[in-house]
Amino acid sequence: MKESKNKERRKEIQYIDAHLDEEVEAMRIMIENTRPGAEHPELGYKPRKRKPKYIREHGKRRTIYMPEIHEQWLHHIIVLILEPIITATAYPYSCGSFPGRGAHYAKKRLVSWIRRGKGIRNFAKIDIRHFYESVRIEILMRELTIRIKDEWFLHVIRVCLIGFKKGIPLGFYISQWLANYLLEPLDYFITVTLGFQITERYMDDRVIMDDNKKRLHTAIAKIKQFLGQRFRLKLKRTWQVCKFWYCKGKRIVKGKEKRWIIGREIDYMGFLFSRERTGIRKSIMLSATRLAVRMEKQKERRQGYFKRHIEAMLSYIGWFSCTDTYACYYFYIKPFVNVGKLKKIISKLDRRANQNERMETGTVRTAA
């Protein structure tokens, strides 16, 4: 099963695999009784109050809700129905959470537009303010009813979101799909109504490119109005319209060749895009080099590495491998860490954790 991939060592997964027929039948009964006017509503899906977890990611504090295994099953069943509905009409360059459309896909697409060199004189960078936390459930359900007419299916989705009056919960498998569904009208508005062809969205983060800067400013004003009227959402105040980076010429200053740079690079998804190369955001690069030095000091003291440091370093290696930053890796990362050794350590730790980990229980469900 997709939702139990790489979790076969967990005892609850082993139990479910051993009693798969009974579990599937119990799930069927639960779904059949999760409908308006069900014959046995006491057998339906009843989510309990979930305890949030807090993580820090890219300098932001995020609230995560972890569903238990049967709740994950229900989410995957919902996505099996939602996925063909959403992907059939989704904008081809809306990335993030779509299969095969991750950050690397988005990066490759944007780089191809830049290399083509047409219609990229200026760019606009916009982001929706607290998108997941600001989505109103009643507005989400209203948008779903536009294309989905099955009251039973809509009721199951609504029950999954009980306890969240405002905001789509991070950590739910259905959340990323619901978010993409909700933003699809915005994609249509920008590409068809406003007529921008060079635009890409990574979740709620978007880049629009055009030769006319005034046209970009007008578009942002209309996007603000569209988001407010239809979804009651706002753009972050950090939106920007800038001339895209290019080298206007070269000159010799004190015997050294210096380039005359006009405009800015596009800071998007943690990458820095220019016409000549793709780099990494300065904060990410500094964090990676500082962590490498810290791990080297731990090694000199004959201390073990922290698991979170190993995971972070392997993540940073991924950034260096897909950008034009090998020189930074060669001088500031490679001398201090052995990537192969780190991979072996984390693999061993993950196997050990899977043997002992227990997933949280939080859903009341009566077996058949």
Protein language model regions, located:
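Beta-rich nucleic-acid/ligand-interaction surfaces
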Residues: 97-105, 199, 207-209, 240-254
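Reverse-transcriptase-like RNA-dependent polymerase core
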Residues: 27-60, 73, 149-163
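Non-catalytic, polymerase-adjacent accessory regions of viral genome-replication enzymes
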Residues: 1-25, 29, 358-368
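Short Gly/Ser/Thr- and Asp/Glu-enriched loop/turn motifs at secondary-structure junctions
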Residues: 48-50, 200-204, 238-240
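Right-hand nucleic-acid polymerase module
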Residues: 67, 72, 76, 163, ...
